[in-house]
Every structure is written in C-alpha cells, then in structure tokens.
Amino acid sequence: MLTPYGYPTILKTACIAILLSGAAHLFAKPLLPEALIFSVFLLLFTLYFFRDPIRTPPDKKRTVLAPADGKVLLVKPVNNHFTGPSSTLVSIFMSPFNVHVNRIPVDGTVTLLSYHQGTFMMAFDHRSLESNEKMEIGIENKELKLHFSQVSGFLARRIICSLQQGEQVERGKRFGMIRFGSRVDVIVPAHVEVTVKAGQHTKAGETVIARF
C-alpha cells in the first residue's frame, strides 16, 4: 500500500526515469544499461519510501502510541508551554529507510497547530528540536494534554500535516508525513509514565510509548 501523500513525488520520479532512459536510448546508447538500472533503482526506492503498511493500534486504553516509525533518540524531562512543567520529551528519529507516514498518538481534539520556519540541521542533533523547521501539534482530551512536533532535517525538507484546528482525531489514524527522514518529538505531562527508553525502535500507531 502506498500513501497518497507520495503520489506527486512518485509521478515525478516515474517521469524522470522515463525521460532519462529515453534520452540515453536516443543520444547515448552505450550508457542505456546504466541509465535503465539507475532509473529502476530510483523508482523502486521512491515506491519503497512511500509505502504505508496497515497498522492495528493495540487494545490498551489510557496509552500514548508512537506517532512515527524509528528509533528513540532520547527521553528527558522538559518544561513545555502546552503540557506544563516537569513534562517528559520522547524524541523519535526516522531514517530514510523507515516508514514515514505519521499517526495520531491519542484520541482527542486538536487544540494547537502551529508551523515554525527554521533551519535544517541534522535530525539527530538535539539542537534541531529548537532551531529546525517544525509543525507543532497539541491534542487534548479529558485526561491529558499531549504535545508533539514534526521536525524537519537536513534531507527532510517537506513536512505534510493534514490536521485542522478543532478536529476530532483517533489514535492510530494517519495525519501526515515528513519526506526523507527526520524526527518527531512527543512531550507528555508530568502524570504520564513513559514506557520506552533511548535506543528502542517504534512503529507508528502500534508501539506504546507512555501510559496514563
């Protein structure tokens, strides 16, 4: 299954592959085999990158799900304008080889949606949390306020977020992606227990990262 978020890029890549192979056939036949191999590889990688496997959220109430596939970079205490003091940050790094479709961590209402321009530092550099381009999202329900950010990186310079202010959302549902790697930072309030640690791998919409 492919994500619709990737359709424009897939179409552009297919056109480039066809044009490249056609140009080699017309003007540089000795290079045609290499052009075909490169074109096929480019198209296959693009299809692989925009894959969107089916995910089934666990039947565990009062849990926070990972919004992204990847590896937990760090877990640390922070103060946050949305979740309050003594909150906890869980940062998930997505390599170019991870599934990049992002999913909703908890049921609730979108009460914060704020885009910030910024730099494009390497996503695994912790300074990127503050300085990089990002989309901040806040979800509230009767039991907690959750803050998370789609953060761009050195390669990932296209954040896609389909959420709307005031929208009712369900845990595990798709809401966007970050193209070609980066990170998603989740911040939970003080009363929420984080259940993952640095180095652990996550799957969006399936891995429980906290409980409340």
UniProtKB/Swiss-Prot annotation:
HAMAP family named among the record's database cross-references: PS_decarb_PSD_A
Record's subunit section: Heterodimer of a large membrane-associated beta subunit and a small pyruvoyl-containing alpha subunit.
GO biological process: phosphatidylethanolamine biosynthetic process
Cellular component terms per the entry's GO annotation: plasma membrane
Enzyme Commission (EC) number: 4.1.1.65
InterPro entries in the cross-refs: PS_Dcarbxylase, PSD-A
Record membrane topology: Peripheral membrane protein
Catalytic residue list: S182 (schiff-base intermediate with substrate)
GO molecular function: phosphatidylserine decarboxylase activity
Family: Belongs to the phosphatidylserine decarboxylase family. PSD-A subfamily.
Post-translational modification: Is synthesized initially as an inactive proenzyme. Formation of the active enzyme involves a self-maturation process in which the active site pyruvoyl group is generated from an internal serine residue via an autocatalytic post-translational modification. Two non-identical subunits are generated from the proenzyme in this reaction, and the pyruvate is formed at the N-terminus of the alpha chain, which is derived from the carboxyl end of the proenzyme.
UniProt keywords, alphabetically: Cell membrane, Decarboxylase, Lipid biosynthesis, Lipid metabolism, Lyase, Membrane, Phospholipid biosynthesis, Phospholipid metabolism, Pyruvate, Zymogen
Catalytic activity: a 1,2-diacyl-sn-glycero-3-phospho-L-serine + H(+) = a 1,2-diacyl-sn-glycero-3-phosphoethanolamine + CO2
Designated name of the protein: Phosphatidylserine decarboxylase proenzyme
Functional description taken from the UniProt entry: Catalyzes the formation of phosphatidylethanolamine (PtdEtn) from phosphatidylserine (PtdSer).
Cofactor: pyruvate
Record Pfam families: PS_Dcarbxylase
Co-factor remark: Binds 1 pyruvoyl group covalently per subunit.
Highest taxon listed in the record's lineage: Bacteria
